[in-house]
């Protein structure tokens, strides 16, 4: 045998690999023990206690047993490519520990553990490192990762003897590959997926990411949520939601003056004067507050990130809990909600629908999701003459406002229009070089807020000149990840305004009192104020 046999196992009075079944079982059990111990570190101790399920030891035993098949499948995968039990154990433990470490890092950064839909964002994390604050994923990261994965694997392959039977080797290799890969493949087969998803749903119950991370550990929780996501009957969910909303197209919206609705989703916008920052000047925001028929603080779908969750809540009018496991990344299954979201309803009622977002069209799969949700036209980053080295990291709100006004001018006077604008200007990171000589992240954020306020004035003044009713909805998608100011924000609710402009303005208007609102109610509230919301939708 190799050097490992002669020296590495010299203290053992027998050769472990002469007992392949016992060694393999022992390595699997060792993996389970290490994984059970390390899974707890996916969340800080305080969060773990806070989200621990309130039930007894019997249920806890069931949760532990439920993790064993997941660990076994990962172990089988490493074993299938090597037929080396020690390597399979090391690979399995490393695999789970890496997932736990990623989950802990994500929670530290954005206060949410790893969720199954994050796997769909892996390519985006490496493609858009700045927007994910992942600039450290550079060449050094790849060298270290490569050396660890392939270097350690090579050492095991060289020093650890294989236990692959001498006879019928190809047969046993294929059998093991089938055992390792077969169950994963069967998850996509309806007759297997549906009962499996139902069983997992009974086990998991509520889709509570933090609680399920405590119960099952990071990777098992990700797998269980993915199985539920694959098997959930969205047609039934959508049918129930449609019945609740009574969203009949013929009862929808009509108006003789061809109104225009502009929804401006302002990236990371929150009025810092709520937190005692009196140095900032936001005259346009103050103006909107006085002119609004409704304004106040907007609850968070997610604090500090995941813009698409707030975005979908506003566009759909759906409470995140109502869309079950899709809530974490609704655009993955956008087609299922096409008939009940606002853009689709408006388009079918004869409105022109336009989505404007000065960022890569493939990000969050918007290039696929938005047409499915009812937007007939998309204006994305490739439509802007933007050079980061010349214009800054993101397209400014001033440039975006000018583009919105230009697109609005193209809308025929006799046609109603719905424009959803998602800005990018104040997305982090707030690093030196973004605003003059400023170096402090808070100062940079405040300066961009003031720039955004000036751009809003440009937009509002332009919209007020139109000869049609205009309804303007403005809101911040989430609080900024401004850790040097607060982590987390003491009150993460953002600001919103529903403002009538141009011919929609009343002759006499008195300022309104602030009203708290939820993102999924925002467009419904606007339509009621505009008298564009029929009884059938209430």
UniProtKB/Swiss-Prot annotation:
Question: Which function does this protein serve?
Answer: Involved in antigen K (capsular polysaccharide) biosynthesis.
Q: Which InterPro entries match?
A: Alkaline_phosphatase_core_sf, OpgB/LTA_synthase_biosynth, Sulfatase_N
Q: Which residues cross the membrane?
A: 16-36, 70-90, 114-134, 139-159, 170-190, 212-232
Localization per Swiss-Prot or TrEMBL: Cell membrane
Q: Which cellular component, as a GO term, is one annotated location?
A: plasma membrane
Q: Which domain of life is it from?
A: Bacteria
Q: What is this protein called?
A: Capsular polysaccharide biosynthesis protein RkpI
Topology of the protein relative to the lipid bilayer: Multi-pass membrane protein
Q: Which UniProt keywords apply?
A: Capsule biogenesis/degradation, Cell membrane, Membrane, Transmembrane, Transmembrane helix
Q: Does the keyword Hydrolase apply?
A: no
> Taxonomic classification, please?
Bacteria, Pseudomonadati, Pseudomonadota, Alphaproteobacteria, Hyphomicrobiales
**Pathway where this protein functions:** Capsule biogenesis; capsule polysaccharide biosynthesis
GO terms for biological process, alphabetical: capsule polysaccharide biosynthetic process
* UniProt-listed CDD domains: LTA_synthase
Chief subcellular location? membrane
